[in-house]
């Protein structure tokens, strides 16, 4: 529950920024939010591994899907905000969008599932963010 609340807070705080600040801080805010979530997950790594690997039938079984839905909604809000700044209209097939966002979260949680040492997980998470940021910039016309 707490990681979901943390994620929602990061999204909400970002949406409170002015449109110009959102554009300028997109990557840094995403990176710091991912780092906070990573730190939180590693503080309770064994619990998170159980949630990620053995939560079928519990209230946690859809954790990643819930995060994906929140991220997709936040992406739409961000795209609309960017349109007001003069950026092109955001057009993406909803299935592809869902696949891309699901891929991000699945990849993010792989460090827990595969017991990646924390220092490596930090590096991988930063590279994951860089990779996805570049792709989203291309898709969004930045």
Regions flagged by a language model, labelled:
Residues 28, 32-43, 58-84, 95-102:
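Amphipathic alpha-helical packing segments from all-alpha helical-bundle domains
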Residues 2-13, 47, 103-114:
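Solvent-exposed, amphipathic alpha-helical segments
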Residues 65-68, 72, 125-133:
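Hydrophobic core segments within long, regular secondary-structure runs in both alpha-
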Residues 2-43:
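Hydrophobic alpha-helical connector segments
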Residues 49-51:
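Short, hydrophobic secondary-structure boundary micro-motifs
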Residues 78-131, 140:
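Hydrophobic/aromatic-rich alpha-helical bundle segments in the mid-to-C-terminal region
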